[in-house]
A protein has these predicted regions:
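Active-site lining segments of carbohydrate-active enzymes
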Residues: 1-46, 143-157
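Extended polysaccharide-engagement surfaces of secreted carbohydrate-active enzymes
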Residues: 42-194
Length: 194
C-alpha cells in the first residue's frame, strides 16, 4: 500500500519514493519465494487470495507506473501460483480448507490478471467459468477481465497435482462435473504455520 501511494506522488518526492520502492522490491521477494518451486503455498487458498492480491496490486502498479516490475513477476513460483487455488478447488468449486481457509466456493480476480500476464488460458478460463457458476465477482474483475479464454476447456487441465514443498496433492475425476469426485491431502509438520 505505501509503495503504491509513493508511486502516486513520485514526481513530488522522487528521493523518498525511490527509497520506499527499493525497500519494497527487496522485501516482497521473501513472501514471493514462498511459492517456490511450483506455486504451492504453506497456507490455504484463502491466504493465497490475500497474499497474491497484494502482490498483483504491487506488480501491476510498478508495471503501469514505471514500465517494469523489476523482474518480480518472473519469479517462477509466483508465476505458477495461480494453479494453487485452482487445484485446491473441488469439482463444485469448494476449497480444500486447511490453514484457516474458508469453506466456500472460491476463485479470484487475480486469475484474470495472471492469465493475461503469463498468457495462461487456464487461469482466465477458470475465473470465467467460476463467475458463470455464481462465484462472487468484484470490481477487480472489471479491471482485469479477460474473455480470450472464455471457451477454455477445463478438462485440458491435469486432474492431479502435487505441490512439492507445500506437501499437498489433489486428485479429481473431472473438471466440469459439479458432482464429481475430488480429494486433497496435506502433509508436513503440524508445527508449520497454522
Amino acid at each position: 500500500g505505501i509503495s503504491i501511494g509513493a508511486l502516486a506522488i513520485a514526481e513530488h518526492i522522487p528521493e523518498i519514493t525511490s527509497k520506499i520502492l527499493c525497500k519494497a522490491i527487496e522485501s516482497i521477494q521473501l513472501p514471493m519465494k514462498a511459492y517456490e518451486p511450483d506455486g504451492g503455498g504453506f497456507e490455504g487458498p484463502t491466504y493465497w487470495d490475500y497474499g497474491s492480491r497484494y502482490n498483483v496490486f504491487f506488480l501491476d502498479a510498478l508495471e503501469n507506473s514505471l514500465g517494469t516490475d523489476f523482474g518480480l513477476g518472473s519469479m517462477e513460483g509466483f508465476r505458477r501460483s495461480g494453479d494453487f487455488q485452482i487445484q485446491l478447488s473441488a469439482t463444485n468449486l469448494m476449497c480444500f480448507n486447511f490453514s484457516d481457509s474458508d469453506v466456500k466456493a472460491m476463485s479470484t480476480a487475480q486469475h484474470f490478471w495472471m492469465g493475461k500476464r503469463y498468457d495462461q488460458a487456464r487461469y482466465s478460463g477458470f475465473r470465467y467459468m467460476a463467475l458463470k457458476r455464481g462465484v462472487e465477482a468484484n470490481i477487480l474483475d472489471l479491471l482485469w477481465f479477460d474473455d480470450r479464454f472464455k471457451n477454455f476447456d477445463l478438462n485440458s487441465m491435469p486432474l492431479d497435482k502435487y505441490f512439492r514443498v507445500a506437501e499437498i496433492v489433489t486428485m479429481r475425476d473431472s473438471w466440469d462435473n459439479g458432482k464429481g469426485f475430488s480429494v486433497a491431502l496435506k502433509g508436513g509438520s503440524s508445527t508449520r504455520v497454522h
